[in-house]
């Protein structure tokens, strides 16, 4: 009976938003794996298209130039939470999209409406085709990409906590410079005209500053299970 019950668990779409360094990726992957859901890192998609722009010599300061080629690269995301993948035109870009160069330019590329339209279409397609449900993490998932998501979560944390976490992820970055970069990124993401970083009105806010990763995961898993039980 248990196996039969497991198969009939309703699919659930979970949107997890928040700025960098709040634990979005670690939390989203763990929650998806624990609950048997697919997982999508939307930030990686924006990093991937930014990497492609840089690699092809596109002027990142020229929105018109970016818009003209936004549809060119083929970006494919693997949604297995235990081994998420991302390729651009068949090339594995999981490592190169995490460099400081890409990190410093992703906001400019992401702000171009044609880029957001292209990536948003990819995200919606992946979310609607996930048979068992999916955890989608990003900055505008609950507000723009999947406004009808079953559950919306907005993670926050103090700038200090975020910088400490982020400096451990990015090569060659110290905490102080990382903190400044994060605050600059926040300002850019929150003020852009197209799909700014924002908390959805119906999102559950979770401050991760003083929580361990495991505590955050348990909190989100509980929220998802409650939502799934109510469907």
Swiss-Prot record:
Alphabetical list of SUPFAM superfamilies matching this protein: P-loop containing nucleoside triphosphate hydrolases
Give the CC-aspect GO terms.
cytosol
Task: Give residues annotated as binding ATP.
Answer: 18-26
What does the UniProt keyword field contain?
Answer: ATP-binding, Cytoplasm, Kinase, Nucleotide-binding, Transferase
InterPro entries, A to Z: Cytidylate_kin, Cytidylate_kinase_dom, P-loop_NTPase
Instruction: Provide the catalytic activity annotation.
Output: CMP + ATP = CDP + ADP; dCMP + ATP = dCDP + ADP
Where in the cell does this protein reside? Cytoplasm
Superkingdom of origin: Bacteria
Q: Does the keyword Kinase apply?
A: yes
Q: Pfam families attached here?
A: Cytidylate_kin (PF02224)
Alphabetized GO MF terms: ATP binding; CMP kinase activity; dCMP kinase activity
Which BP terms does GO give this entry? nucleobase-containing small molecule interconversion; pyrimidine nucleotide metabolic process
Q: EC?
A: 2.7.4.25
What enzyme category does the UniProt record give?
Answer: transferase
Chief subcellular location equals cytoplasm
The record's family statement is:
Belongs to the cytidylate kinase family. Type 1 subfamily.
Q: Cite the NCBIfam families for this sequence.
A: cmk
* HAMAP family linked to this entry: Cytidyl_kinase_type1 (MF_00238)
Protein name, UniProt field? Cytidylate kinase
Source organism = Streptomyces avermitilis (strain ATCC 31267 / DSM 46492 / JCM 5070 / NBRC 14893 / NCIMB 12804 / NRRL 8165 / MA-4680)
Name the lineage.
Bacteria, Bacillati, Actinomycetota, Actinomycetes, Kitasatosporales
